[in-house]
Amino acid sequence: MTRSLKKNPFVANHLLRKIDKLNTKAEKEIIITWSRASTIIPTMVGHTIAIHNGREHLPIYITDRMVGHKLGEFAPTINFRGHAKNDNRSRR
């Protein structure tokens, strides 16, 4: 279910402050965050945000097509390596 329109999109306060500070300075710097639930807003476009996936921070460059999505959507937490092979020779 989507978030109610009368509420604003959720963005962590510390992340919003860092974005605003970099926008006023017009600098580009990697922003490290653990806030996977934050929504990408238009002021984040053009920045690189390192999103935590449970083990490490993955640097993600924010484009205009990502606006409205959550940060966690772009940092997968598990890696599927395929199903176990059915090798009958090793069972004998």
From Swiss-Prot:
Keyword annotations of the record: Chloroplast, Plastid, Ribonucleoprotein, Ribosomal protein, RNA-binding, rRNA-binding
Any one cellular-component term (Gene Ontology): chloroplast
Pfam families assigned to the protein according to its UniProt record, in alphabetical order: Ribosomal_S19
GO biological process: one example: translation
PROSITE patterns in UniProt: RIBOSOMAL_S19
Subcellular location: Plastid, Chloroplast
UniProt GO molecular function: rRNA binding; structural constituent of ribosome
HAMAP family for the chain: Ribosomal_uS19
Family as reported in the entry's similarity comment: Belongs to the universal ribosomal protein uS19 family.
Functional note: Protein S19 forms a complex with S13 that binds strongly to the 16S ribosomal RNA.
Name of the protein: Small ribosomal subunit protein uS19c
